[in-house]
Amino acid sequence: MKLRLSALALGTTLLVGCASSGTDQQGRSDPLEGFNRTMYNFNFNVLDPYIVRPVAVAWRDYVPQPARNGLSNFTGNLEEPAVMVNYFLQGDPYQGMVHFTRFFLNTILGMGGFIDVAGMANPKLQRTEPHRFGSTLGHYGVGYGPYVQLPFYGSFTLRDDGGDMADGFYPVLSWLTWPMSVGKWTLEGIETRAQLLDSDGLLRQSSDPYIMVREAYFQRHDFIANGGELKPQENPNAQAIQDDLKDIDSE
């Protein structure tokens, strides 16, 4: 099963090749760049090659694709009520009801969310990148705040990563115990890293991998906050990239 999530993971990596390295767009700032580069070197030159990447390779090579899809569907289904609320907060009740329908159908008919029944039944109900509370803040023009590279976590901003904590107050996420939340986060992280294994070469070939990772973070969250659209004034190749993402989604 090919998800828009996978398209975005690839697309946001490709976006950086033509993105500006400036940090004054849409409230971006990187006042701790020296510290962040040190943390980046730890995360991506120590933690990733010796721990994260080997786990992701084993996950990709030894876990059957149907099992991976099922676990991804299940963890994604847990977020559907929060996504619904965020769309309502953004003034988009139609998309809010789409995600309510996804949650209802997949929970009742899809074995608690392991099977994406809604997406298979109707193309308009296919899974998309989740809109979290940080995306809602971005939708209303709230700036990111300082960009930080955290050890064991990676890119962090107060708006998107801190703001997303608000989603934990909505059911079903509010029902998860701390170990359950950590397990969900770990599964999602391993799956995302496994999807990006084929893009490792792009990072290695970059003249400044830190800038590439930082700009990929901003581009991805801009894309989500803007409703899945790229603004041409911020990226002259926005329309071409938008078309490529649509082609990937249609496969």
Curated annotation (Swiss-Prot):
GO terms, biological process: intermembrane phospholipid transfer
Pfam families, sorted: MlaA
Topology relative to the membrane: Lipid-anchor
Consequences of knocking out this gene: Mutation leads to accumulation of phospholipid in the outer leaflet of the outer membrane and increased outer membrane permeability. It confers sensitivity to SDS-EDTA.
Region: Disordered, residue numbers: 228-251
Signal peptide: 1-17
Principal location listed in the UniProt entry: membrane
N-palmitoyl cysteine lipid modification positions: C18
GO CC annotation, single: cell outer membrane
Keywords: Cell outer membrane, Lipoprotein, Membrane, Palmitate, Signal
Lipidation (S-diacylglycerol cysteine): C18
Localisation per UniProt entry: Cell outer membrane
Functional summary from the UniProt entry: Involved in a phospholipid transport pathway that maintains lipid asymmetry in the outer membrane by retrograde trafficking of phospholipids from the outer membrane to the inner membrane.
Family: Belongs to the MlaA family.
Name of the protein: Intermembrane phospholipid transport system lipoprotein MlaA
Record organism: Escherichia coli (strain K12)
Gene name for this UniProt entry: mlaA
